[in-house]
């Protein structure tokens, strides 16, 4: 085949492949534009993203904020308050001090310790979100709310327990961002790395397709 035929075949291939690459990159960016899911067991990734959206919407409704559009969300699980040995020791000291001060019986002390441990082990999340007015397109300042994910037995008594979310209220934005911002930065770097990997993969695929097309056109 002559050079013109090869060039025509090559550009024809570009017309087919480039739109596909652009679509992959576009939807990848849209999907990864925000971390929008609770962790924990049970439920699909999509359903957990929906949980976050519904939780923010519920908060907005409770605040009488109508006509607001959710622009961005980021979910961060609260650090385990009993993660370190020092924290566990402090917890045990506090519990023992209460038991001693109130002269609790062995049974009452055991119950109190169990209740306090359960409170510390709650599944708590901070939800960072930004909204804007759908009519005026004015953006609101970013806010952070805290929510608890908990379970209760299925009404039928059979099957998996029901997964519920309780909104605990607004948090101090500056205080929470001290530990959330590093997580957001790390997530952004991960997304950038993933986007770079996908672009490089798409470029390699295009190059292989180009070589294959050149071989078949000879």
UniProtKB/Swiss-Prot annotation:
Residues 184-218 are annotated as: Disordered. InterPro entries: DUF5385 (IPR035325). Residues 205-218 have a biased composition (Basic residues). Residues 184-202 have a biased composition (Basic and acidic residues). This is Uncharacterized protein MG364 homolog. It comes from Mycoplasma pneumoniae (strain ATCC 29342 / M129 / Subtype 1). The lineage of its organism: Bacteria, Bacillati, Mycoplasmatota, Mycoplasmoidales, Mycoplasmoidaceae.
């Amino acid at each position: 085949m002559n050079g013109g035929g090869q060039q025509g075949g090559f550009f024809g291939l570009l017309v087919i492949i480039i739109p596909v690459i652009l679509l992959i990159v576009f939807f990848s960016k849209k999907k990864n534009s925000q971390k929008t899911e609770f962790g924990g067991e049970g439920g699909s990734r999509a359903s957990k993203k929906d949980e976050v959206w519904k939780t923010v919407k519920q908060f907005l409704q409770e605040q009488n904020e109508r006509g607001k559009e959710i622009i961005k969300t980021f979910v961060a699980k609260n650090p385990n308050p009993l993660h370190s040995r020092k924290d566990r020791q402090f917890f045990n000291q506090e519990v023992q001090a209460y038991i001693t001060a109130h002269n609790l019986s062995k049974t009452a002390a055991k119950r109190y310790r169990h209740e306090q441990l359960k409170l510390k082990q709650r599944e708590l999340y901070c939800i960072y979100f930004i909204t804007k007015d759908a009519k005026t397109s004015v953006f609101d300042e970013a806010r952070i709310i805290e929510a608890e994910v908990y379970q209760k037995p299925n009404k039928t008594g059979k099957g998996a327990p029901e997964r519920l979310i309780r909104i605990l209220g607004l948090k101090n934005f500056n205080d929470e961002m001290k530990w959330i911002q590093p997580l957001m930065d790390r997530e952004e770097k991960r997304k950038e790395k993933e986007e770079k990997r996908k672009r490089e993969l798409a470029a390699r695929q295009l190059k292989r397709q180009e070589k294959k097309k050149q071989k078949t056109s000879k």
